[in-house]
């Protein structure tokens, strides 16, 4: 069974919060590329989902995909792909749905901090609404969302 995590990096693995290192030039040095500025604890949560589901990552971020892909690969994340760069939210939805259809994906989730999430859900077909998981850009990928994603990808809900 092929499982995919469509990942928007900004707001999911890097967050907007004064209490985190994302906003400073000094990052946690787990990821040496300053442009990526991913929070290590958020990346570990993504790693948990992948380890527990055997899902592959498809980057949907309009945010420095080249260095993000390189840094994730350097940290042993495999099976990386990406959608076209810098898609607006309507094109992103269509891009995801086309990718799912063309690649015969069995299960997928979308981790995105899109601010107009209700409008997105209006555009998504009913059978896929649970696959779109709203992320609060000030918290990023939480433990609760990680567990939900794990259960969804493994047909436990």
Which residue ranges define each predicted feature?
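Short amphipathic alpha-helices and their capping/turn segments at secondary-structure boundaries
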Residues: 1-4, 100
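Alpha-helical substrate-recognition element adjacent to the catalytic core
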Residues: 3-90
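C-terminal cap/substrate-recognition subdomain and adjoining C-terminal extension
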Residues: 70-157
């Amino acid at each position: 069974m092929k499982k995919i995590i469509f990942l928007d990096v900004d707001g999911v693995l890097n967050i907007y919060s004064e209490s985190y290192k994302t906003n400073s030039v000094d990052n946690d040095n787990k990821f040496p590329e300053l442009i990526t500025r991913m929070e290590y604890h958020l990346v570990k949560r993504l790693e948990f989902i992948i380890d527990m589901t055997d899902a592959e990552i498809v980057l949907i971020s309009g945010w420095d995909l080249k260095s993000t892909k390189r840094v994730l690969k350097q940290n042993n994340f495999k099976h990386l792909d990406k959608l076209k760069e810098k898609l607006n939210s309507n094109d992103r939805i269509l891009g995801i749905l086309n990718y799912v259809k063309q690649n015969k994906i069995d299960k997928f989730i979308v981790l995105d901090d899109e601010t107009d999430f209700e409008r997105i859900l209006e555009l998504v077909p009913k059978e896929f609404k649970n696959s779109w998981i709203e992320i609060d850009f000030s918290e990023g990928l939480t433990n609760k969302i990680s567990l939900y994603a794990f259960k969804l990808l493994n047909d436990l809900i």
